[in-house]
């Protein structure tokens, strides 16, 4: 009998000058980047939290705490691969992921397919198992004022097929 589990993830980071902007493992052209202990890739972080949440495994802060210097500047794709391994060790696999990135700028449409490709490769799944959408916050709140970028993700995990 097939079992399914669903997880939800969210992340937000502040935009600051002199940092690269990385979303979904792709470096984007922008004047500012996201501030964080790792590469601050909010999309990948939201996906990791959704995957971990689906199996009640906590959140990324539990596995990759910002207080631990080994994760300083870490590539979030490396962290995502570790999360994927945790899931596989427990007999689960990704059914699909649906994510939304919320940013006023830069416009994300040209980057969405490369992000899907990169994330699918890291997770070892087909590109059509990942949906990434982009929207703005209509100039409302910290994201609307271009102070940060946020991401939401939902992940479906399957076992027993």
Swiss-Prot record:
Pathway: Isoprenoid biosynthesis; isopentenyl diphosphate biosynthesis via DXP pathway; isopentenyl diphosphate from 1-deoxy-D-xylulose 5-phosphate: step 4/6
Pfam families: YgbB
Cofactor note: Binds 1 divalent metal cation per subunit.
Enzyme Commission numbers on file: 4.6.1.12
Cofactor names: a divalent metal cation
Annotated site residues (Transition state stabilizer) in this chain: 37, 136
Cleaved signal peptide residues: none
Protein residues bound to 4-CDP-2-C-methyl-D-erythritol 2-phosphate: 11-13, 37-38, 59-61, 135-138, 145
Recorded coiled-coil stretches: none
SUPFAM superfamilies documented for this protein: IpsF-like
Recorded GO MF terms: 2-C-methyl-D-erythritol 2,4-cyclodiphosphate synthase activity; metal ion binding
Catalytic activity: 4-CDP-2-C-methyl-D-erythritol 2-phosphate = 2-C-methyl-D-erythritol 2,4-cyclic diphosphate + CMP
Taxonomic superkingdom: Bacteria
Stored CDD domains: MECDP_synthase
GO biological process: isopentenyl diphosphate biosynthetic process, methylerythritol 4-phosphate pathway; terpenoid biosynthetic process
InterPro entries: MECDP_synthase, MECDP_synthase_CS, MECDP_synthase_sf
Keywords, comma-separated and alphabetical: Isoprene biosynthesis, Lyase, Metal-binding
Family statement: Belongs to the IspF family.
PANTHER family: 2-C-METHYL-D-ERYTHRITOL 2,4-CYCLODIPHOSPHATE SYNTHASE, CHLOROPLASTIC
Summary of the function given for this chain in its UniProt record: Involved in the biosynthesis of isopentenyl diphosphate (IPP) and dimethylallyl diphosphate (DMAPP), two major building blocks of isoprenoid compounds. Catalyzes the conversion of 4-diphosphocytidyl-2-C-methyl-D-erythritol 2-phosphate (CDP-ME2P) to 2-C-methyl-D-erythritol 2,4-cyclodiphosphate (ME-CPP) with a corresponding release of cytidine 5-monophosphate (CMP).
Binding partners and assembly: Homotrimer.
Protein name per its UniProtKB record: 2-C-methyl-D-erythritol 2,4-cyclodiphosphate synthase
Organism: Thermosynechococcus vestitus (strain NIES-2133 / IAM M-273 / BP-1)
Lineage summary: Bacteria, Bacillati, Cyanobacteriota, Cyanophyceae, Acaryochloridales
This protein's encoding gene: ispF
